[in-house]
Each structure stands twice: as structure tokens, then as C-alpha cells.
Amino acid sequence: MYQWNLPYRKDDVETGVSSRRPLLYPAMHENPELRWGFIRKVYSIIAFQLLATVAVAATVVTVRPIALFFATTGLGLALYIVIIITPLIVLCPLYYYHQKHPVNYLLLGIFTLALAFVVGLTCAFTNGKVILESVILTSVVVLSLTLYTFWAARKGYDFNFLGPFLFGALTVLIFFALIQILFPLGRVSVMIYGCLVSIIFCGYIVYDTDNLIKRHTYDEYIWAAVSLYLDIINLFLYLLTVLRALQR
């Protein structure tokens, strides 16, 4: 495995890197080619996860008996609860084994398929127009924030300070979501809650992309991909929540 602090000099002939090659950020002390290779690998994994999510979700939406089984039977409800908690359970061993091949890929597959099933069941009872709007909006936001973060990193900006604030805000909203199970929110409150959580995950996209550019070691490609994949999926689901509330 490559090491994080691999030295890099603009005039290093052994690395084969031209002195004219731009750095990803001003204080970069590693070979840009290695970091770009790592970034491409992470985004390739994310692309595979998203394609798998689309395939599974599309199957659940189009094959109506699947969604009806989960919605109308006791066994289906029990399985749905298991599927919901599976990604949370798998995250623990995935974090521990994210550098252990091939266990990391196996756990990543289980995690992705379980979350894809959750997305599919959520979309199965949602208007197609709302789903399309959510997909388009999520794509635009993710692309815009990713490009902005790469541009900001090149200019010398750092977003590591966002970590504690995002974690604190997300913790508060998670407890708020647990409370609303006992005391359901109205339509306006659901919209406000969905917007707030969407903003938080926009912040997480910037934060995790900044970590991808500067901080993740080269053997942390699985965890880097999982972090950004979770940001994208959660952003989509909460934008979907907001748009569904608007249609009521």
C-alpha cells in the first residue's frame, strides 16, 4: 500500500512528475498522480454503488408484489425493519475491516444492497415525478458542491473545521427524528426538518470531499467511498421527503 506522507517535489525526476503539473492544494507534499489515482478509485466505487442502488430500487419499484409484500404483511414489515437496521450494523465491521481485502468489498456489497433496498421501498410509494425531481436536484447539488470543493482546495481553503459542527447538528436532528415517532410532525414541520437535514448533508459532501482530497490515506478508499455514498443517498432521501410534503 502507498503511504499517506509520500514526499513530493516539483523537480523530482524519479517520480516522473512534471514541475508544471498543478497541485490539488497549495500545501501538498505528495505526488499528485498518486492522489488523483486514489480519487478516481473512490469515485469508481461510488459509481458502482449508485448503479447498484438504481438497479435494485428500480426492481423494487417496477415489480409491485415486492413492495406490496413489505407493506401489507407482518413478515414483510419484520423484514423491512431488518433491512433498515442492516446498514447500521454492517457499518461497524466495515469501519474495522475497511482495509482488509476482500472482506471490505463483501461488507461494502451487503451495505450497498441493503441501503438500495431501503431506497427502493421508499420510492415504491412515491410519485414518479417527485422521484425524478429528487434525482435531478441531488445530481445538480452533488456535482456543484464537488466542483466547488476541488476549486476551493486549489485556492487554499480548508473545510476540516466543519466536522464538529456537522456532527453536532446531525446528532440533534437524529434525536428530534426519534421524538417525532411519538409525536408526528405536520406537513410544514416535515418540510422544515427535511430542508435542515438536506443542508447538513450538503455540508457533509463538502467536508468528505475535502477529506478525500487531503486527508484519507491511499488504503482508505472503501471508507472514503462509503462516506460520500451515504452523503448522496441521505441527501436524495431528504430532498424526496421535502418534495413529497410539498405535494400533499
Swiss-Prot record:
Q: Does the keyword Iron apply?
A: no
Q: Does the keyword Transmembrane apply?
A: yes
Membrane-spanning intervals of the chain: 42-62, 74-94, 105-125, 130-150, 165-185, 188-208, 222-242
Which superkingdom does the taxonomy of this entry point to? Eukaryota
Any one GO biological process: cellular response to unfolded protein
The record's listing under InterPro entries reads: Bax_inhibitor_1-related (IPR006214)
Location comes to: Membrane
Q: Name one Pfam family in it.
A: Bax1-I
- PANTHER family recorded for this chain? BAX INHIBITOR-RELATED, PROTEIN LIFEGUARD 3
UniProt-recorded name of the protein: Protein LIFEGUARD 3
Native source organism of the sequence: Arabidopsis thaliana (Mouse-ear cress)
Taxonomic lineage from the root? Eukaryota, Viridiplantae, Streptophyta, Embryophyta, Tracheophyta
